[in-house]
Amino acid sequence: MEIVKKINLIDDEFSSAEANEILMDLYNKNINFNKIQNFSSQIRFGEDDEKALNRIAQLKESVSSIAEILEEAKAQNKKLKIKSFIEIEYED
């Protein structure tokens, strides 16, 4: 697929506390979105949304990895450079 747009979401340096707030908020919102998708599937179809459940598991794994990095940065009194981009493509 051809990338329609690439948007710079985050590109800055943060303390571990700031990085924690930004990243955990992003991940928690995404996890909650997928929980709602799964709940909707349960109500409408009487079954789990496997795609949403898999995504939740992936996101929770990422949260654990990020938490380790943030703790290490805090312990070493280091700032974190974070870059994040969103790529938007058309799907058939």
Predicted segments with their positions:
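N-terminal acidic leader/helix
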Residues: I3-Q37
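Amphipathic, hydrophobic secondary-structure cores in small proteins
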Residues: N28, F33-S65
